[in-house]
Amino acid sequence: MKSSVTLLMAIHCHQPVGNFDFVFEEAFAKAYEPFLDVLERHPSVHLALHYSGCLLDWLTEHRMAFLSRVRALVARGQVEVLASGYYEPILPLIPEADRQGQIAQMRAVLRRRFHSDAEGLWLTERVWEPDLPSSLARAGIRYTIVDANQFVIAKPWLPTALQVQDESFWDLLGCYATDHAGSSVLLFPASKRLRYWMPFQPVERTLEFLKRIRRDEPVAVTFADDGEKFGLWPKTHHWVYEEGWLDQFFSALERESAWLSTNTFHEYLEAAAPNGCVYLPCGSYEEMLEWSGGSFRNFFTKYPEANAMYQMMLRISRHLQEVRSAECRVQSSMVKRRRGRTNSRLIGRATRELYAGQCNCAYWHGVFGGLYLSHLRRAVYHHLIGAEQLANEAAGQAASVSILDADGDGSEEALLNTPSMGLLIDPAEGGTVTEWNLYGPRINLLDTLSRRYEPYHEKLKAKHA
């Protein structure tokens, strides 16, 4: 007799730092709120929800009642809220101190808002690098989700019975332990098949697949994807809500409860053990690997403008860490204690600005806007420049000149700072000013972008040939 199947679902909802308010409003009205409306009507359907810090900030200001509804679902055990870096950074790309700070900020907000001590993490853009287990375990994270394609390299050593292969897809069931430097976390492989089918295929097709993966022992399969697919993407609101796809899907899960269950990831791990150990290379979901040429970091080669933003972020993070360290060395005289209180506030504000400037969306481009959207780049620069200004103020820095490799090209540049602006000058380029930040309005006057060839241009050329 075949055993049971557990469907693990994680829904990720996010809007970038600097996005237009009307986009938040539309996403809430078309996707976030109606999804919750349907979920509340199906209390036996359990899943995980992730709201990025950027979105939580907006919801706190504009839709507090919505957060209360989420908290009620968490309280009754139907929903698990997942942590992440607060402002949705690509975790492998930011310094360790910032990884810890961003995750700690998110976990603190989840405790305050939802009374939940999150142990699971939504990994931004599912960008994985092998050193992450150390950072995640140190931050109090037990498990995260990566795409099944990242496990393909380990296929020969994975349990054959938990691999599902056909002409279109390869799925991996269960969860797996991995470690780095003695720290371990659990990885759930997310199904590309389910990501492509839900919510676009009829409910019956997904149910047929779930029946097909039944084994002699209980198994679990993971679905993880963006909440915006459930209403905000073109034509999905009509299909998912007006035509009733989501309600039909949840009803089908309840109807088939004799052999099919839904759990949160936390619930699942209370009763199940890992299905083995695995060690994954750097990776992400398949489409991201296509856009980036196999490594997310290639975006910084393809787009020098993205690299300029990235290197500026790293430079400010290092500077802020130096200011923190210097502050810790201040002796405890009365005058210095007063100065220390002021500096602590400045450093705290600078840290928040830095974290907001680490929001990933403006650092890369796939098929959506990303780096090409000037308002997203402008928002990143706004926060990074604010962080630099506050760090300079905390350091008591009036004017300075520094010689450093500011753009990671192996050659030195000159960084000039005054109370009103910062200039980056590249001698190797004939003294070109490559960065010109005004602290008052918090803008980079050289924030421009060259259009480049993208693979999807071939489709346009073919269409109009």
Where do the language-model regions lie?
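Active-site and substrate-binding clefts of carbohydrate-active enzymes
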Residues: 2-33, 40-42, 164-185, 189-193, ...
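Short, well-structured secondary-structure segments
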Residues: 5-96, 101-105, 119-123, 142-148, ...
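Alpha-helical packing segments of well-folded alpha/beta enzyme cores
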Residues: 31-38, 69, 102-110, 128, ...
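Positively charged, amphipathic and often flexible ligand-engagement surfaces
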Residues: 86, 90, 149-155, 187-201, ...
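CE4/NodB-like, metal-dependent polysaccharide N-deacetylase domain
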Residues: 98-125, 180, 211-223
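Catalytic domains of cell-wall/extracellular-matrix polysaccharide-remodeling enzymes
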Residues: 104-162, 229-249
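An extended acidic
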Residues: 453-465
